[in-house]
Amino acid sequence: MNLEDIYRDAGAYLKGHFLLSSANHSEYYLQSAKVLENPILAGKLADELFEVIKNAGVEFDSVCSPALGGILAGYELARAGAKRFIFTERVEKVMSLRRGFSVAKGEKFIICEDIITTGGSALESAKIIEELGGVVVGFAALANRGFCKVHNMRNEGKSSCKLPADKPLFALGNFEFEIYTPEECPLCKTGSKAIKPGSRGN
């Protein structure tokens, strides 16, 4: 299953000038919602991701995703493994666990996103789980944007990755796009204005 082809076929591999949730800019953006709007395809991707985690010997009880982008991917991963699913969400810009969700002491979690860039939102979710007595055994995503090392791939992680080095990240694909600070962005220097398509913008 070629993830890049899947994103292109779904119209989810976007080219333009994008403002990322990290406040950095990129010429490319992966709009996973366009892939996950197809329940059959979403299920197939989640089944494959679950098999990757299972084959690595990582056992978990539940899946937690940061809202909004990670919810569909995380729910489908939980379905694939017949696990419980919960999600965290931002309340006044602070990641929180609400809606009656609870975490049992020692409960093992995979934190699942649709896309991992630097892993900031996933790390925020992981900290909440651990503060409540849960155990984060790994991270998962449909796609990695090239900053974090993926356990089931041969890419090298970068210093900007925020995920802990002692916990594995599993993904179905690795996309390496150039990302720029607003001050260094060559697209801005041509007069182009970045648009914000991501989860924190709309």
From Swiss-Prot:
Protein origin, superkingdom: Bacteria
Keyword terms, alphabetized: Glycosyltransferase, Magnesium, Pyrimidine biosynthesis, Transferase
Disulfide topology: none
Residues reported in the UniProt entry to bind 5-phospho-alpha-D-ribose 1-diphosphate: K93, E113, D114, I115, I116, T117, T118, G119, G120, S121
Molecular function as annotated in GO: magnesium ion binding; orotate phosphoribosyltransferase activity
InterPro entries recorded: OPRT (IPR023031), Orotate_PRibTrfase_bac (IPR006273), PRibTrfase_dom (IPR000836), PRTase-like (IPR029057)
Annotated SUPFAM superfamilies: PRTase-like
GO aspect biological process, one term: 'de novo' UMP biosynthetic process
Task performed by this protein: Catalyzes the transfer of a ribosyl phosphate group from 5-phosphoribose 1-diphosphate to orotate, leading to the formation of orotidine monophosphate (OMP).
PANTHER family the record matches: OROTATE PHOSPHORIBOSYLTRANSFERASE, URIDINE 5'-MONOPHOSPHATE SYNTHASE
Family from the record: Belongs to the purine/pyrimidine phosphoribosyltransferase family. PyrE subfamily.
Subunit and interaction comment: Homodimer.
Protein name per Swiss-Prot or TrEMBL: Orotate phosphoribosyltransferase
Organism field: Campylobacter fetus subsp. fetus (strain 82-40)
Gene name of the encoded protein: pyrE
